[in-house]
Amino acid sequence: MESNAFGSSHLPSQALVVLSEAASGLHEALRGQRPFPSRVIPFDFPLLQLPDAKDLHNMSLVGNYFNPHLLLNHGMLVANGAAAAAAAAGAGPASYFASDRSPLGKPSVLSNFSLPSAFSPPKYIGISLDQNLFNGSESFRTDSASPTCTSHESMEGSQDYDAVEKGESPRSNNSQDPRDLRHLHNAGKSHQALATSSSASSSSSSSCSTSNPAISTATSSVAVSMASHLAASSPHHHPHTHAHSHPHPLAHPHAHSHHHVGHHVGAPPVSTAVTTHHHMAHPHPLSHHHAAHHAALASLSMAGLRAVPGGLSLVSGLQAAAAGGAIPEMCPVCGLKLSAEEWHTHFLTELDRLYKLSAGFERASLQATYMFAPPCPAQENAIRTSHNRWETFQRIRNNRQNRLRLKVRKRKYGEMYMMESLYCSSCPICKRKYALETGKIPPEDDAKSQEEIETVDVESCNDEVPDSGSELATPSSGSSGTVMPPSSMHNSNSQPGKLDGILYRTGCVLSQKDPHPDEHDVSTNVTTASSSSWPGEAPTQAHISVKTVSELSSTTHHYYNADSCGVGVNDTNSSSSTHNNGGGSNKDLMMDTASCQNDSDEDVIVDDDDTVKLTSKINYGKIQRRQDEQNVGSSRSLENISPVEERPRSEPQVSSTEPGPMDISHNNNNNNNNNNNNSNSNNNNNPSTKYAESMENSLSQLSSMGVPGLTQLDTKA
């Protein structure tokens, strides 16, 4: 096809092309119809303000007025002054639609329509020359103008526009789209027949298949109404021929002698009136169009503008201006002052601006709110489906991220992390449960337990061991020299051979007067050699040793096996050897240990020399003060020493709760020892007696301090 005269850049959309091309000589017609009277147009009228004029692009305000009574009401057309020009005089019943391209020529097009509204859903009527609509058939279009369109094609009209640019119909291949009138402008240059141009132009003006049908009809009414009223202002009839070119100079001779009969678009075939129709007295380029064609365009455009509040006032102002022949001083839409030369250019600019306001972002919303109807079910389903899909996507993404995080944690920390996450990370009870279930102690707990073993306080050891089975003997005030037997110091209900995860500490004190220096028991010293010294006694032996180490424990390396332990203090005082007879003169202070509930092979903790402190310097100071206070006349006699409490010097034992070979009923040689003790207990000047009493006091203090291993004190006189 030839290129458009206006160009696609100036008129970017096909709907505006339809508006501009339908009145193809409007520019010259506006110049030829001067002057206009200025007395009728009330520019300060409220309906001429900008908001009312911009309502032309609002589909909801326009759509419900486009009913058949607006299109078919010939009384309104008579009031507009176009009914007389609707039909030519005496030409017959043939309509101007009956052209060479139309298959059948019926008297009227719109008389065959039976729908209550031209735009009522779900049917959409599009007039096409190839779809045989002039026989009464209806076309169900699904392009972007259809309000019942539900496909993606409705939102994308570019494919139709591309086909129109080539001059082809988007629905038919062998004909041109009636919406595209650019070929009509060029066809007039090549002297095509008037019937072809007139029928295509009129069908396109009456067609509603543009991308925005209400806007195209409403905005084109301004241009067409001016031309129609200018054409209807003369009572004379001027015949013309078909053989003139489309654009004309102002001086064009009209020497034609045939008449045309035109049926009005809104009138039935029986309501045609034969009148004389003449253009203005001077020649103008609109004279080549048929009079009935202009009347039809005028009736449609007037009906469209009357449907809009601003458009109605604009129509009335233009009608008054056309009747008086004066140009307005300012634009009724924007209020801009215009000269006579700028009026028609500004008019087309306003049409272009109104269409651009309505073409873009409101296109989808116009379909949803068309004629105040609810959106199509397919559109509602699409919105609901998209919302549901978004929620599903969010849920799936969250679940997937959680699974990935879980895998990363398992790969990084292993199953131990997953087991530990089941319990509280700060609660020690939960940590203990975790350790019991997994069978291993967490590394941080293992380090803490090792520190506690190395730096444990001896005084608070009894509080930490509630089930140790050792009840400390507290000497009574009445009998300070008597000590309970070791069999009563132990809990007989305790289970032997079971540590229960609790650590025990033992300290054994053995005071010996041994003439044989090679016989020394494995002992743990209570009083260090540097801290205290007794009068007339030799330096004490102090050491920590293990007699038998059988094997290491399975849980920790701090557990060892020990048979017995005691503290040996050799007293070499000469006075004690002279007042005592033989081996029976030895003063022995022994404290047995209640180490666990096992035999002599039981696990016992052995720590460094610095950490195991059973007494302090305060205790030593007290012992020395009591020794000074006790003189020769105030010494106590140790009475009621039972043979059960006696122990041989060479055989220190570890008390146990089990009846067996380690039972503490050693009765050998107890009679001699008892007699020796009784004979020597009356000696008030004996320093060994002072030593025994002082050791008794120190052991009672140790028992009150909470040392769990002190159970028995044996004294030999």
UniProtKB/Swiss-Prot annotation:
Cell compartments where the protein resides: Nucleus
InterPro entries in UniProt: E3_ubiq-ligase_RNF220-like, RNF220_mid
Region Disordered, residue ranges: 140-214, 229-270, 440-498, 511-539, 563-594, 624-717
Annotated Basic residues bias: 235-263
GO molecular function terms noted in the UniProt entry: ubiquitin protein ligase activity
Domain of life: Eukaryota
Protein's UniProt keywords contain Nucleus: yes
Bias (Basic and acidic residues) ranges: 442-451, 513-522
Gene Ontology biological process terms, A to Z: negative regulation of DNA-templated transcription; protein ubiquitination; synaptic target recognition
Cellular component per GO, a single term: nucleus
Phenotype of the disrupted gene, per the record: In embryos, M12 position is closer to the ventral nerve cord and situated ventral to muscle 13 (M13) and external to muscle 6/7. The longitudinal orientation of M12 is also oblique probably due to an alteration in the muscle attachment sites. Also displays a reduced number of synaptic sites on M12. No effect on muscle fiber size. RNAi-mediated knockdown results in the fusion of the costal vein with the L1 vein in the developing wing, producing an adult wing that has a continuous wing margin with no separation between the end of the costal and L1 veins.
Listed Acidic residues bias regions: 452-466
Biased composition (Polar residues): 140-152, 471-482, 630-640, 687-704
UniProt feature, compositional bias: Low complexity: 195-214, 523-533, 570-580, 667-686
Main location: nucleus
Alphabetic keyword roster: Nucleus
Tissue expression pattern: In embryos, expressed specifically in M12 (at protein level).
Cross-referenced PANTHER family: E3 UBIQUITIN-PROTEIN LIGASE RNF220 ISOFORM X1
Function: Required for the correct synaptic targeting of motoneurons RP5 and V to muscle 12 (M12). May be involved in the negative regulation of Tl in M12. Involved in the correct patterning of veins in the proximal (costal) region of the wing blade.
Protein name as annotated: Protein Teyrha-meyrha
Source species of the chain: Drosophila melanogaster (Fruit fly)
